[in-house]
Regions:
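Membrane-embedded transmembrane alpha-helical bundles that form the catalytic cores
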Residues: 1-276
Length: 277
């Protein structure tokens, strides 16, 4: 039960403390991208990548935690997706339950990778387009699915299987994939392709409102909370977590944790992003 409660609280923290607070700044920029400068828009793009991860993984953690309390194992739904080195690896880590379903009931029945390279590329692309349409009958979701489908196909074409990467190459691939995924989230987040293009064009704008101070405060608090979370090691190792709280340093860190949460929870909460899907 302890692990289930811990998982639930972790998910609730991701949603209420992280996702909702980041969303305040992100929503303001996406509502009027023409009013903000390029750096503010770039911070909003990064912010939405964090927001949707904290929102949806938090939602999943809460469900997994509740199930664990009743001694049910729902399995992992996210596996550090932003550490993926390529689009295909990203989809093996993001929304694992949905990705597995599309693999088993769409990609493999279409022939998977068993009917030659060209058919493999077509099957990949079709699967990703359908996964985009699963989110809604909107042009942005269709384009988003096609965007990821094209990314997976290009990776298949250019990627070298079995090749060993140096740490620098791994870091570079991870950073490049994060940029690729973040650009895709702009299309996913936008109400229309026109709004998505306005955000992309705004990245190169030098004038406009500078919203950096708000992002710096929010991101700083989020990073501080994340570091404190790592310090408590609330990852299922219950004895370590309890031992940490028994020390003066543990009590002090807990007070700081509560203070930072109070700093972030200055406005109302919003609905889960994936509640619409």
């Amino acid at each position: 039960m302890y692990l289930g409660v811990t998982r639930f609280v972790t998910g609730l923290t991701k949603k209420v403390v992280f996702a909702d607070r980041i969303g305040v700044a992100v929503n303001a920029v996406f509502a009027a991208p023409a009013a903000y400068n390029g750096l503010s828009i770039a911070m909003a793009v990064v912010g939405y990548s964090l927001q949707i991860y904290c929102d949806f993984s938090g939602y999943s953690d809460m469900a997994i935690g509740i199930a664990a309390i009743w001694d049910f194992d729902l399995g992992k739904n996210f596996n550090l997706p932003y550490l993926a080195e390529n689009p295909s690896d990203f989809w093996r880590r993001w929304h694992i339950s949905l990705s597995s379903w599309f693999r088993d009931y769409v990609y493999i029945p279409l022939g998977g990778s068993r009917r030659g390279k060209l058919r493999t590329y077509v099957n990949l692309f079709i699967t990703m387009v359908l996964s985009g349409l699963w989110h809604g009958a909107n042009a942005t979701y269709l384009v988003w699915g096609a965007y990821h489908g094209l990314g997976c196909v290009i990776h298949r074409l250019l990627g070298k299987r079995g090749s060993q990467k140096t740490p620098w190459q791994t870091a570079l691939c991870t950073a490049a994939n994060c940029l690729f995924v973040s650009a895709g989230w702009v299309i996913f987040r936008a109400d229309s392709m026109a709004q998505a293009m306005a955000v992309f064009c705004g990245l190169f704008r030098g004038d406009g409102i500078c919203y950096i101070n708000v992002f710096v405060v929010i991101y700083g608090l989020v990073i501080a909370l994340t570091l404190l979370y790592a310090r408590f090691r609330l990852d299922g190792n219950a004895p370590t977590a309890r031992l940490a709280l028994d020390t003066f340093r543990g009590k002090l860190l807990l007070c700081v944790w509560v203070f930072l949460i109070a700093m972030l929870m200055y406005c109302g909460n919003s609905a889960f992003i994936y509640a619409n899907f």
